[in-house]
Amino acid sequence: MRMRKKKNLVPRMEACGSCLIRDPFALRGRWRTLMPGARELRVELGCGKGRFTADTAAAEPDVLLIAVEKVPDAMVVAMERVTEAGLRSVFFVDGDAALLPDMFAPGEIDRLYINFCDPWPKSNQKKRRLTHGNFLKLYRQVLAEGGQIHFKTDNDKLFAWSLEEIPQFGFQLSEVTTDLHRDGPVGVMTDYERKFFSEGKNINRCVASMVPWEEPAEPEDRPDAE
């Protein structure tokens, strides 16, 4: 479903301009200058309206968080939420995952968040999934040694497929669950996650830690899980 066009988008974004990075490529290798002394640099791919972004920043104020979002109408809401909360450790980038190596230097990112991404359910769309091997290889270029991907989704088929895909590209899985909130709310939730939890929908989650890996000549292209 397409998001309704926000009124006064440009002036609203300008009003939150202090947290908007207009030229992320110029900061490649220098992101930590935005917050000297930051414990970690984390990147959220697809921040949406920013509930997870703002709540994570509030819970861990010593972490530099870069929120990447390619839908300006969603990002402006996230920017306003962060600005109104007075959070100084969050910055926003209008972009997508394919540009990560152009925006970040090798080893610059400690953690990536992928929350409720588009599942791209058709088999001929699999290369667009953010857990596809092509993207995983990009993440390897920018993650620090032992860096992590924290992945959550409500889509059971995407999760099952991802659990097979991710280890093939030099990531070790841990904290795997198909019902994160079985015994009650766990951790910081996104807007989607709150909605799904209230409806009793299970949430899938895993952590993928980068380990040494050599790319094979021709990685196997697997069919979708049934």
Located regions from the model:
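S-adenosyl-L-methionine
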Residues: 1-43, 51-58, 80-106
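A short glycine-rich, Lys/Arg-flanked "PGG" loop and its adjoining helix->strand segment in the class I
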Residues: 131-145
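Conserved glycine-rich SAM-binding loop
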Residues: 48
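Class I S-adenosyl-L-methionine
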Residues: 164, 169-226
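Conserved beta-strand signature within the Rossmann-like core of class I S-adenosyl-L-methionine
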Residues: 146-153
